[in-house]
């Protein structure tokens, strides 16, 4: 079994660690760095629970080896909190009851955080477009409507639509 020293950035912090060449990125984040917000569900990249941001884009950490992250930037759900307080998207999930058991929540948050900050031309006032956006993240509990309500409450599209209704 071979091991490698990898250097990467995780949540803005430079990290250098020795890892086994077969260690999955999800396991490295959870076991080595103790960032347990990233969940592992299906271990096949289907459920989306392990979604992180890899160089700014959503990626399934259960499908990547830790050594593949060498020289790259990783952002996990822990980075969404601001000074120990919930970030806006996390707060919206809390207020709109966008979670029940919470297992899928980190992956959904990382997907949605990316979508809100990237220029994807998504109409966040459209349930259909939001459902399409989160179709790669499976949730057994909520039925998705409260997740949709949460994303609508923080999206710029919704804020623009609300202000146009007032005019």
Swiss-Prot record:
SUPFAM superfamilies, per the entry: 2Fe-2S ferredoxin-like, CO dehydrogenase ISP C-domain like
EC number(s) given by UniProt: 1.17.5.2
Reported temperature dependence: The caffeine dehydrogenase activity increases linearly from 25 to at least 66 degrees Celsius. An incubation of 30 minutes at 70 degrees Celsius drastically reduces the enzyme activity to 11% of the initial value, and 77% of the activity remains after 30 minutes of incubation at 42 degrees Celsius.
Keywords: 2Fe-2S, Iron, Iron-sulfur, Metal-binding, Oxidoreductase
Primary enzyme class: oxidoreductase
Binding site for [2Fe-2S] cluster: 42, 47, 50, 62
Known function: Coenzyme Q0 (ubiquinone-0) is the preferred electron acceptor and, to a lesser extent, coenzyme Q2 (ubiquinone-2) can also be used, but oxygen and NAD(P)(+) cannot. Is involved in a caffeine degradation pathway that allows Pseudomonas sp. strain CBB1 to grow on caffeine as the sole carbon and nitrogen source.
Protein's name in the database: Caffeine dehydrogenase subunit gamma
Species of the source: Pseudomonas sp. (strain CBB1)
Upper taxonomic lineage: Bacteria, Pseudomonadati, Pseudomonadota, Gammaproteobacteria, Pseudomonadales
């Amino acid at each position: 079994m071979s091991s490698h020293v990898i250097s990467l950035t995780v949540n803005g912090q430079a990290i250098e660690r020795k890892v086994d060449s077969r260690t999955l990125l999800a396991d490295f984040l959870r076991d080595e760095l103790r960032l347990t917000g990233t969940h592992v569900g299906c271990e096949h990249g289907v459920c989306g629970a392990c979604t992180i941001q890899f160089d700014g884009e959503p990626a399934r950490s259960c499908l990547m080896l830790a050594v593949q992250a060498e020289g790259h930037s990783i952002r996990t759900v822990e980075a969404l909190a601001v000074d120990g307080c919930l970030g806006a998207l996390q707060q919206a999930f809390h207020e709109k009851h966008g979670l029940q058991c919470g297992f899928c929540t980190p992956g959904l948050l990382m997907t949605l955080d990316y979508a809100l900050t990237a220029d994807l031309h998504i109409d966040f006032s459209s349930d259909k477009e939001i459902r399409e956006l989160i179709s790669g993240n499976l949730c057994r509990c909520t039925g998705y409507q409260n997740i949709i309500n949460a994303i609508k409450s923080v999206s710029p599209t919704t804020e623009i639509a609300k202000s146009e209704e007032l005019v």
